[in-house]
Amino acid sequence: MKLFPYAHATHPQWQLAALLVLAQLRSQMALPAYAAGPTLALIYITDHYANDAQDILDHLSAELPLVTDWSGTVGIGVAANNVEYFDEPGIAVMLLDIPADQYRVFSGVAPLGLGFEAHTALVHADGATPDLAELVQEMALRTESNYLFGGVSSGREQGVQFAISGDGNMSGHGAAGGVFSGGLSGVAFGAEVSMVSRLTQGCKPVSASRTITEADNNVVVTLDGEPALDVMLRDLSLSLERPQEALQMVRSTLVGLVHPLEMGGEKTAQATTAVKQTGNFGNEVLVRHIVGLDPGRRGIAVAEFVEKGAQLAFCQRNVQAAKADLIRICAEIREELEPEDTTPHATKRIQGAVYVSCSGRGGPHFGEPSAEMQIIRRALGDVPLVGVFASGEIAYDRLYGYSGVLTVFTD
């Protein structure tokens, strides 16, 4: 199989950006190394173009008649190989050369049919959807691998999603023409689609992992039997006698949570702690904001339902830790595709990649424009890639924050 054609552009007028995208796609499809007739497109636009989403989709689909299926969303930024368009107009498109019987585009109004066995799925979500975390879990259960990858739309306007199936507009969309908001949409893939996916966390633990010994909805009341607020102040070396300093530090602090497993009808602590021996978070850790303090019970409120038996560690965003972990997952992907103990002809080649990163990681977070994508290019190589900066990242059956999800398609 050949490389996936991809393109990206920015311009104040979407028509000119689309013109540049089409020129890039057509030039690549004319090259022997790239697929000449792919039928599935991924499209990501920045929120500067959100109000023009329908016109953009109509134009691109008319100019690319062989492409019968479209999926995508909007973000505060979009990405491509070696470049980011963050908080500015931007379009990124990739054309996937995958057999038609190995994928299905779906949405909330045109859900995945029973006739297709999904092995995994790329999922785009609207953050305003009620019970989103539960919907993601339910969607994961509908796949053979119980693994999803994707993200939650981000931007200043209402979330926009794209979904068109092979026979035109998806049933139920009516005049929407493949552009809508709310719920989940994406692409389900069959078992014959070869891919490797990894999650990278962007926060560094600044405390030991502790067990939640009392909780009330989203309030952590005690940690290891002590008032949670007292534990946090001690771990962060803070004093309420210096309230401004304490408030500033708490605002920049998050929590890494590992929910307890359900075993034998009773809640028990995870076999693993939130913090690995290497000092970083594993895939099972969910990073969430501290949203308030409870002086009466000396507890802390977090942006997640918590329960007794969960593991918790305080953490902070850390650029160096994020860079190192991003390089790590790229190295793991390359190792899986090019294991040292295989002959050269057994090496798999990357056809294309999708990267969903947190909007909090984009822009200046890595020190300079497009720095995150440049790290991926140096570590993974010069491969076709598109992506989006999301307000929540989807991996496995969960919603993550301050993370990145890198997925590569292989031959």
Enumerate the language-model features and the residues they cover:
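Contiguous, structured surface segment used for ligand recognition
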Residues: I56
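Small-residue-enriched flexible segments
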Residues: M1-A50, H59-A62, V67-A353, C358-F366, ...
